[in-house]
């Protein structure tokens, strides 16, 4: 059986010391590639680019797309002005991810968003975000943990009979969070299941 090629949206990392200062590097978190390998896929890192032809040609070879984490999504993309607690934004990365989404949807391949990736998908589909969790009066759980990423710190309830519940084999999950934003309005065609 052919292993699926899963593209991962890449970001850019700048060195901060020595000969690496201002030397941009394409990267993704190692957890993304390892998780895809453990699930039986082949991870393909998609380097940041503004070249739409390269984006389309790359996605044409993929069986699925993982939108990775990173900067906050630029609020003007969802019709809001930046508020005081907005983090660092990178509008060019937003456009890169939007182009990946467009190409993936045209090919009708599965898309999975983690952290910023889920937020980008929501904004791409016309949804909006809380620029900081402090602006959401219903948020009571601590989402910006001061723990190691491997330590589960709060429970997530998952709706029965959803792809997510089927994939993990249960309806609750103890996880960690390192977020300061969340979905405000859900984008077209999307459904909150956890």
What are these regions (language model features)?
Residues 1-112, 123-124, 130, 134-174, ...:
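N-terminal beta1-alpha1 cap of cysteine-dependent amidohydrolase-like domains
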Residues 115:
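Conserved G/P- and acidic residue-centered "switch" motifs that form tight phosphate/ATP-binding loops
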Residues 118-121:
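Hydrophobic, aromatic-enriched interface-forming segments
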